[in-house]
Amino acid sequence: MFKLKTKSGAKKRFKFIVNGKIKRKKSFKNHLLTKKENKRKRRLSYFSRVHKSDIKNIKKQLLLN
């Protein structure tokens, strides 16, 4: 039998919060930042929660069923 391995991309992108929810970084903050407003860049730097319909798939990728 082979070993089950976690998806390394998911391992780097998601972190768990105490109440069982998952947090993630927002997208659109990597490049082409000169034409974006400071307010928008500041909002994009905050963490966001993963939607409840996606939690099952993320736990599956992290082998947490």
Swiss-Prot record:
Q: Which GO terms describe its cellular component?
A: cytosolic large ribosomal subunit
What InterPro entries does the record point to?
Ribosomal_bL35, Ribosomal_bL35-like, Ribosomal_bL35_CS, Ribosomal_bL35_sf
Could you tell me which Pfam families the record lists for this protein? Ribosomal_L35p
Record keyword Ribonucleoprotein present: yes
* Keywords of the record: Ribonucleoprotein, Ribosomal protein
Regarding protein family, the annotation reads:
Belongs to the bacterial ribosomal protein bL35 family.
Q: Could you name the domain of life of the organism this protein comes from? A: Bacteria
HAMAP family referenced in this protein's UniProt entry, alphabetically:
Ribosomal_bL35
Spell out the protein name for this chain. Large ribosomal subunit protein bL35
In terms of PROSITE patterns, this protein maps to: RIBOSOMAL_L35 (PS00936)
PANTHER family from the xrefs? 54S RIBOSOMAL PROTEIN BL35M, LARGE RIBOSOMAL SUBUNIT PROTEIN BL35M
Q: Which GO terms describe its molecular function?
A: structural constituent of ribosome
Q: Which gene encodes it?
A: rpmI
GO biological process, alphabetically ordered: translation
